[in-house]
Amino acid sequence: MIEISGLTKTLYGGGHKVEILKSIGLTIPSGQFIAITGHSGSGKTTLLSLIAGLDNPSQGTIKIDGQDITKLNEDELALLRGKRFGFIFQNFHLIPTLTALENVVLSAELNNTPGATKKSEDLLGIVGLGDRQHHYPAQLSGGEQQRLSLARAFVNEPNIILADEPTGNLDSKNSNRIIELIRELHRVKQATIILVTHEPQVAKQSQRILTLEDGKIIDDQINREL
């Protein structure tokens, strides 16, 4: 479970104070698929970065299964991210000199995940890249590269997946395919998924939709359509 209380992020510059997030309170049960929406500048990506421990809040707490990650040092946060988190970004961050399989295996080996090669091969099969595992990223389409990113994110069997605009650079066909795969992996792996998107049709594929505006939560609803 993720419990966020009084979370505030304030930036200072040029004699001005800008509150990016304003006393956010939020509880995300384990295994929930939640989408965070809002206009550009509403605080979506900042909230995701704080949950990942990639940035420090000005005030407030972020507890993951009761542990306040705002109290951890950088080494402790790095260990937590490696063991508990998977990341999916708009830009794929793949290593161009490694094959698809090697990209996934490397992520597993860096986190000492047992059976790295077998798990990587299985996940590449799930995302439809089983026959392309020996291709390099440059030989894959944009949609295929994002599917490779999905496999890499899930290979360490993380408890929490953080996805920042994972369909932002894709056409509608590939966007739909990625969201279908995220939903399928969510069903199979039972990870908590927090997905930031500005696309309403993408948000509607989640179990819960949270809307931010001007650094505050203005709407929080269970998706009854699913």
Question: What residue spans do the PLM features occupy?
Answer:
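Short, low-complexity polar/charged micro-motifs in intrinsically disordered terminal tails
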Residues: 42, 221-222
